[in-house]
From Swiss-Prot:
Keywords in alphabetical order: Cell membrane, Coiled coil, Cytoplasm, Cytoskeleton, Endoplasmic reticulum, Membrane, Mitochondrion, Phosphoprotein, Transmembrane, Transmembrane helix
Region annotation (Necessary for targeting to centrosomes) ranges: 1-163
Stretch list, region Disordered: 433-467
Protein name, UniProt field: Sarcolemmal membrane-associated protein
Variant or mutagenesis effect after changing K799L: No effect on location to mitochondrion membrane
Main location class: membrane
GO cellular component, one term: M band
Entry's localization field: Cell membrane, Sarcolemma; Cytoplasm, Myofibril, Sarcomere, M line; Cytoplasm, Myofibril, Sarcomere, Z line; Cytoplasm, Cytoskeleton, Microtubule organizing center, Centrosome
Residue intervals annotated with topology Extracellular: 824-828
Topological domains annotated Cytoplasmic: 1-802
Effect of L182D: Loss of interaction with SIKE1
Residues recorded as bearing Phosphoserine in the entry: S148, S448, S452
Length: 828
């Protein structure tokens, strides 16, 4: 059965190694070379000091068809695409690897003693399936900086913001780990200081023992000198006094040296206590920093959850916005359709109104003219009746005088009367027809043409007098004329009925216009209510975003305070370390001074011993026994001195070794401090970058909220553009800015169109109001004209017919008053 293949290729920044072809029949161990397992081209063992023996495992899962890598508690870690799989000395979960990934085993380590840097293993891995096909590349998968572990779900992968927060927490945890290592090293330093203190105590004890031996030798020498000399009492007294003075001087010098040593010891103890206090303070501060770090991590997690919740809320609000905009567009479309229908109806009603108004004016003019003609006919009939009565009376009188049969005459008179009446009626009908034709001509002509019917009427009146005489002679023609007059009266009644019908239609049109107005107002009220609700929703969302921004600002302030506190604590610990180093140097100097003083004392003692030996050689002949004792004492003293010197040399060498160890550890601490400083600088820069990104995201969210408030009256095209803007916001902020500018321009265009439509609506409303005002003015003028007509009728009934030209002139003036505004309105 063929097996999967993994090829490890060396990269330029890696520790050099040959290309490895490893077949993954079973899980393959990756580690450092040992005696039993040497590096070869078919295994994953590398000759690198940075790797652990059991560093990691790599294998191929035949069920899922995927390659996995696991860190097995390595000290320096395993990295996939610069992402560490687990913490130090912890086993990681299996993580999927893809072909083309960059895998790093360990990190670069620098030795302090030799200043040698040991490189790590950095390789590009190529994976081949058992069928010989290359595994999928990282570029073919969803862009994610971290490989997904086996026990994680792809849906729960964090966003870029939460991943950066996780990286920050990882950096903080590594810094805490380094601080713990520093604490351990400080504890070892404290132990070394205690050991040096004990060694100094033992050295002081040895010095005191040496002083005691020297004092005893001095006493023995004095005794030998006193015994060997056979001197007088005065000389003995003088020697004793001199010896006592020397003894006193030696004692004073020894006491002063002891006092100095004790003072230095007290100072050293005091400094050690101060160092211990500073260590305890630093430990307390470290614990406090750990607690603060845990709190900040919890707050960062809460912030990430809140941020995700805010993003979801923004999505929900955007969905609601889309739904509301869709409803608003539907309402706008309905409103526009109704508006168009109402506008069309209004235009039709205005046209009908104009037509009806023209009909009313024409009928009113016809009615006025017919009324005038009827009044003139009535006057003529009265005159004719008076004439006929006079003639009848004259005929009756003549007949009564003649005494003949009057019945035939009466019948003839009645026939004559009927014929006259019928003739007048036919004349009236013909005159009404002529008046209608003249009215149509008068509407097209000027005021001079409107005055022409009055002249014609005056000429007709003169002709009517002549026709009256002819009517008496032609009764049959007059009867037909009277019939025509009756028909004209009936047509006048029909015209009145038509006027009433037109008035009813006008009232109905006004009612329709009022109902359309009410509908428009209702639609406007609904639109305003929806706008208010939408504005309230937008205000609530802006308030929530402002609250989240305030919380983010508070967290920024807290992180800045923590960073400042951490920097101050680091500086204080650095100052304390510097002071401890200075104190150690002072202690070294004091030890050197003590050693030099001790050497001077030993030299002085050796000189005194030489003097004593010379004196002993002088007195050797006198006291051989004392010489033997002195030689034995000298031998023992030399042995002890040699032993003391050997012990001191051993202690000096041991102290020098410890000093070298301390210096090495001090150098290591300094390098670690420098690395910590660098890491702190990196962390501060990353925090600043994170803060800048958070600030940019806040600005972008503010811009999005402002854009959402601007895009309230946008349409479906703007919704698609807003969706594209949101997707591009997740990908690239620069593209988002450009798209936002486009969306703003489009929103401004839409807003301008909306303003234009509003202006058009306002103009239409103004026109509608103007038409209503004109209607009201026309109705008022009609009422005034009716009142004037009634007054004129009353005056015509009361006054004789010769005033008819004046009435015609008044009617012409009213017609001009009615028609001139209509012409002025029609001209624009």
């Amino acid at each position: 059965m063929p097996s999967a293949l993994a090829i490890f290729t060396c990269r330029p920044n890696s520790h050099p190694f040959q290309e490895r072809h490893v077949y993954l029949d079973e899980p393959i161990k990756i580690g450092r070379s040992v005696a039993r397992c040497r590096p070869a081209q078919n295994n994953a063992t590398f000759d690198c000091k940075v790797l652990s023996r059991n560093h990691a495992l790599v294998w191929f899962d035949h069920k899922t068809g995927k390659f996995y890598l696991q860190d097995t508690k390595s000290s320096n870690g395993t990295f996939i695409n610069s992402q560490r799989l687990s913490r130090g000395s912890e086993e990681s979960p299996p993580c999927e690897i893809l072909s083309g990934d960059i895998i790093q085993f360990g990190v670069d380590v620098t030795e302090n003693t030799r200043k040698v840097t040991h490189g790590c293993i950095v390789s590009t891995i190529k994976l081949f399936l058992p069928d010989g096909m290359e595994a999928r590349l990282r570029s073919d998968v969803i862009h994610a900086p971290l490989p997904s572990p086996v026990d994680k779900v792809a849906a729960n992968t964090p966003s870029m913001y939460s991943q950066e927060l996780f990286q920050l927490s990882q950096y903080l945890q590594e810094a805490l780990h380094r601080e713990q290592m520093l604490e351990q090293k400080l504890a070892t330093l404290q132990r070394l200081l205690a050991i040096t203190q004990e060694a100094s105590d033992t050295s002081w004890q040895a010095l005191i023992d040496e002083d005691r031996l020297l004092s005893r030798l001095e006493v023995m020498g004095n005794q030998l000198q006193a015994c060997s000399k056979n001197q007088t009492e005065d000389s003995l007294r003088k020697e004793l006094i001199a010896l006592q003075e020397d003894k006193h001087n030696y004692e004073t010098t020894a006491k002063e040296s002891l006092r100095r040593v004790l003072q230095e010891k007290i100072e050293v103890v005091r400094k050690l206590s101060e160092v211990e206090r500073s260590l305890s303070n630093t430990e307390d501060e470290c614990t406090h920093l750990k607690e603060m770090n845990e709190r900040t991590q919890e707050e960062l997690r809460e912030l990430a959850n809140k941020y995700n919740g805010a993003v979801n809320e923004i999505k929900d609000l955007s969905d609601k916005l889309k739904v509301a905009e869709g409803k608003q567009e539907e309402i706008q479309q309905k409103g526009q359709a109704e508006k168009k229908e109402l506008q069309h109806k209004i235009d039709e009603m205005e046209e009908k109104e104009q037509e009806l108004q023209a009909k009313i004016e024409a009928l009113q003019a016809d009615n006025d003219f017919t009324n005038e003609r009827l009044t003139a006919l009535q006057v003529r009939l009265e005159h004719l009746q008076e004439k006929t009565l006079k003639e009848c009376s004259s005929l009756e009188h003549l007949l009564s005088k003649s005494g003949g049969d009057c019945t035939f005459i009466h019948q003839f008179i009645e026939c004559q009367k009927k014929l006259i009446v019928e003739g007048h009626l036919t004349k009236a009908v013909e005159e009404t027809k002529l008046s209608k034709e003249n009215q149509t001509r008068a509407k097209e002509s000027d005021f001079s043409d409107t005055l022409s019917p009055s002249k014609e009427k005056s000429s007709d009146d003169t002709t009517d007098a002549q026709m009256d005489e002819q009517d008496l002679n032609e009764p049959l023609a007059k009867v037909s004329l009277l019939k025509d007059d009756l028909q004209g009266a009936q047509s006048e009644i029909e015209a009145k009925q038509e006027i009433q019908h037109l008035r009813k239609e006008l009232i109905e049109a006004q009612e329709l216009a009022r109902t359309s107005k009410q509908k428009c107002f209702e639609l406007q009220a609904l639109l305003e209510e929806e706008r208010k609700a939408y504005r309230n929703q937008v205000e609530e969302s802006t308030k929530q975003i402002q609250v989240l921004q305030a919380q983010l600002q508070r967290l920024h302030i807290d992180t800045e305070n923590l960073r400042e506190e951490k920097d101050s604590e680091i500086t204080s610990t650095r100052d304390e370390l510097l002071s401890a180093r200075d104190e150690i140097l002072l202690l070294h100097q004091a030890a050197a001074k003590v050693a030099s003083e001790r050497d001077t004392d030993i030299a002085s003692l050796q000189e005194e011993l030489k003097k004593v030996r010379a004196e002993l050689e002088r007195w050797r002949k006198a006291a051989s026994e004392y010489e033997k004792e002195i030689t034995s004492l000298q031998n023992s003293f030399q042995l002890r001195c040699q032993q003391c010197e050997d012990q001191q040399r051993e202690e000096a060498t041991r102290l020098q070794g410890e000093l070298e160890k301390l210096r090495k550890e001090w150098n290591a601490l300094e390098t670690e401090c420098h690395s910590l400083k660098r890491e702190n600088v990196l962390l501060s820069s990353e925090l600043q970058r994170q803060e800048k990104e958070l600030h940019n995201s806040q600005k972008q969210s503010l811009e999005l909220t402002s854009d959402l408030s601007i895009l309230q009256m946008s349409r479906k095209e703007l919704e698609n553009q807003v969706g594209s803007l949101k997707e591009q916001h997740l990908r690239d902020s620069a593209d988002l800015k450009t798209l936002l500018s486009k969306a703003e321009n489009q929103a401004k265009d839409v807003q301008k169109e909306y303003e234009k439509t509003q202006t058009v609506l306002s103009e239409l409303k103004l026109k509608f109001e103007m038409t209503e005002q004109e209607k009201q003015s026309i109705t008022d003028e009609l009422k005034q004209c009716k009142n004037n007509l009634k007054l004129l009728r009353e005056k015509g009934n009361n006054k004789p017919w010769p005033w008819m030209p004046m009435l015609a002139a008044l009617v012409a003036v009213t017609a001009i008053v009615l028609y001139v505004p209509g012409l002025a309105r029609a001209s624009p």
